[in-house]
Amino acid sequence: MLRYSVLSSQTRLLSASRQRTATQLLANPIASNRIITGQRYFADHKNVPPTSPTPVSPESQSVIPPQTVNPVTATPTAQVQTSPPSSIQPPKPPVETPSSSPIPPPTPKKTGRFRRFLLYLILTSGIAYGGGVFLALKSDNFHDFFTEYVPYGEESVLYFEERDFYRRFPNATRHSNRLPPIHKEQSQRVTIPSKSGLSWKVSEEESDSASLTQKGPHNSAVDASKDASAVKTVIKAKEESAEKKAPVKKEAAPPAPKEEPRTPAIATPATLELIKVEGADEPVVQELVRIFNDIITVIGADEGAATKYAAPVSRVRTEVETIGQKISSLRADAEKAAKEEVEKAHALFDESAKKLMQQIEQARAAEAAQFREEFEAEREKLVRAYQEKIQTELSRAQELAEQRLKNELVEQAIELNRKYLNDVKELVERERDGRLSKISELTANVNQLEKLTTDWSDVIESNLKTQQLQVAVDAVRSVLEGATSAKPFIRELVAVKELAADDPVVAAAIASINPTAYQRGIPTSSQLIERFRRVAGEVRKASLLPEDAGIASHAASFVLSKVMFKRDAVTDGDDVESVLVRTENLLEEGNLDAAAREMNTLQGWAKILSKDWLADVRRVLEVKQAVELMETEARLQCLRVES
């Protein structure tokens, strides 16, 4: 229903919008043509009127000549009306004066607010109602509210609950209206026993207990009576329905002879009575009675079982009633004993409460006396403290008054002195204007000269310090370059450090020098070359040794090193002889850094033998690099002073 209403409302809205669109398509070209035909230019081509006949409106069959219609300029895109024809009739032009007929204005566009509001209201109401039904099926509290206050809420919820029930249990009402099946009499059944005929086994006598549990002539008297009564009821119902359906005009057929029902051999037993225990308030007794009543109900449903188990059921009823009476008596005895215990506990509690109240009263009296004494002591203490506070406040107020008076006197004296100084200053200014008018200018010039002198003295001092640092660095270099042997240069380095105490670069350079270098000195270039030649001889001897060489390997390497030829310095190679030749050439050129790099490429025994020489070369390079860094910093400070 809700979906159909929404679709119908959408269809109405679409048809209304189509009608408005068609009306606008009919009206807008006319107005635009009036504007276009009024604007003509010399470059425009004259529009040729269409030769096709003018379409005739559905209401009017009169033919309008094409000369009476205003020419319409062709647009790039033709507008084709795809909507159904509008119900609004176009205006009929007058026949007498077709040129002066006014064109009607376009119809105002309908907003459709009411339809849109109605559509939104219906959609919102439907969604809210559906959501309410869904919540009512999920929540019990909302179910009560929805079915009580919302119109048709209870019917909607019941409808969906029934649908849910039928979906879960599709076979619930399928066999509800059918009649019970008619059972045939036991005498009409023809059965063949399973053990009939011949068999290879010797026949055995069956026990009586097994025959009693099986169906047969010995226990089918009740069933036969039940089947006979059921057949009689069904036959009677069919005859009554046939008599009602038979027509009145036709004579009724003679009824068939009715078969008299056979009387059962055993009389129908009386129904078993349920167990009722008076005063059974205990849950255990009630549960026991309910269980036995269920058993009695099940037994009573079967007539043969009711007769068979009547005596045990009566005995069980008696036992259950006896048990109920015993439980009631035990409960009464327990209640009586509990009541006595409660009375004793109440008496004991009353005595204890009286004793406790007496103790509380005594403790309260003692505490009241103690509190009274403490209160008096505290009151006296507060009185003394209050009096001391009053005395202190009075003394402070008196001191403040005296101090305020002294301050006022001092302020008056200061004010008098200020007035006196102002008078003196005015007199001095007058005198200065008269005789000493140039003193302020002279004082300013003197201050400026003092400032310039101070600045130049700072510049001279920094320049002198920079020159001293440069001299100290040159002294260190001269000691290193002019020495013929290893010579310590501690004094020169200490002088540099004292002169550049505030320079972090010079301090870092001095700290990078190994203490052994400036305490014992560093070897000269000639000493390094001489020592390298000695080390090179040993390296050549061990150049052919493997890492795990023995005595024989050492002897063989020593012999072969004597017959090895010395290579040229420009040869390239990674062998020991090539590295030694290149290193010696670099040492003769004075390039210690490259020589150390070449020797560092050696491996094995050659590198182990040249380890001490490499350490000396590194120490020399570190000292030279530090001295160069200090010289650069000294030059930089000189440039700063000059700028």
UniProtKB/Swiss-Prot annotation:
It is found in: Mitochondrion inner membrane. Residues 236-262 have a biased composition (Basic and acidic residues). Residues 1-42 form a transit peptide. Residues 87-108 have a biased composition (Pro residues). It is a single-pass membrane protein. The chain crosses the membrane at residues 117-137. Residues 44-110, 173-263 are annotated as: Disordered. Keywords: Coiled coil, Membrane, Mitochondrion, Mitochondrion inner membrane, Transit peptide, Transmembrane, Transmembrane helix. It holds the Pfam family Mitofilin. One of its GO terms (cellular component) is MICOS complex. InterPro entries: MIC60. Residues 59-82, 188-197 have a biased composition (Polar residues). Residues 138-643 are mitochondrial intermembrane. GO terms for biological process: cristae formation. Residues 43-116 are mitochondrial matrix. Residues 317-451 form a coiled coil. Residues 220-232 have a biased composition (Low complexity). Component of the mitochondrial contact site and cristae organizing system (MICOS) complex. Component of the MICOS complex, a large protein complex of the mitochondrial inner membrane that plays crucial roles in the maintenance of crista junctions, inner membrane architecture, and formation of contact sites to the outer membrane. Plays a role in keeping cristae membranes connected to the inner boundary membrane. Also promotes protein import via the mitochondrial intermembrane space assembly (MIA) pathway. Belongs to the MICOS complex subunit Mic60 family. This is MICOS complex subunit mic60. The lineage of its organism: Eukaryota, Fungi, Dikarya, Ascomycota, Pezizomycotina. The gene is mic60.
